[in-house]
């Protein structure tokens, strides 16, 4: 931050410095301050694509409490040039926003726009951003293409906090203990169990906490975190090798910290928490048999630890592994809508566990 302040002292209208400062502040969980400096960046340079996308990625994750941060989607859109709007990242953020708002017609059109984006623009994205865009476009596309019965939108809500998995059953109805609820998603992109287990305060905790404390007290809350931690390249498996720590120990400690964090946040909220475990992984033909087995073992270890610690704190656990597992702990492919996420077909199975 000091470096950016020095740059701004030399050149006060440095839109790039404000944008970079926004990224750093967001990473530190200082969300209000991040929005303020993104706003400054865009005041200097209204069609600055990076700052537009960075503020949008934060704003989408803070639906529907974004008004508390002085951010207005409509005002933010009026100054945009068509060049920014044609960018793949912009269309995917709008796809996620409209899907979160249950505006399926608009979501369809943003997905169509994304798929019509200039492939050159897509190839210029950082690999991480390209994967993000393609994954959300495909996943939400599958959710939109599923059958949507004309069910009444129940007044009672069960809130589903999580990373992309919180979209699996979004805007669907579910019966819990003879009462009907509508499942309402609250997303934190890329959040892992690991993020909640460590001391550091960051955007993952800040966004999740903002949602958690904004819900009416005594709400029913589904929690979906941990699947990213079980992937071969961005969680327990690579961390265990790097830290030279046994996988079991690392998973146990992380899961304990993850559940404890939500227990601590819940002291004043008194929500009914349901920890949703990780579904059986889809066998990935791109990995070796050994790596596939390691992923399956990781999922099993995480789910065991999650059961142990959620029970310790008297929370409920929803076991999606149980009905998604086929041979050797891999997915039976009956409930997955892609290689990672479950879809609405899982709901009757989940309902059975909650009745």
Model-derived features with residue positions:
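Substrate-gating cap/lid alpha-helix
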Residues: 283-320, 340, 345
